[in-house]
Amino acid sequence: SYHLDESGYTCRAWIFDISGRRISEVVNHDLLGIEGELAWNGLAVNGSKVRTGVYIFYAELVHPQGKIERYKEVFLVK
């Protein structure tokens, strides 16, 4: 889940494997509210379920006034 100080941010977010290959796109230029949740369905771009392993969530939030926020989180899929 997330909480932003102000509205107006758009978000792009991806899932990468531990080798740095992009596995999935979570959102693409979606307008975010001040609070919310970004959820990934556990599927790769081709629609198949990903294997057990370590993955990286990476998001870029861009505000119309030029602010850019970047977030990265490592997680395990079992």
Feature map (PLM): residue ranges:
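Glycine-centered tight-turn motifs at strand-turn-strand junctions
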Residues: 8, 22-50, 61-68
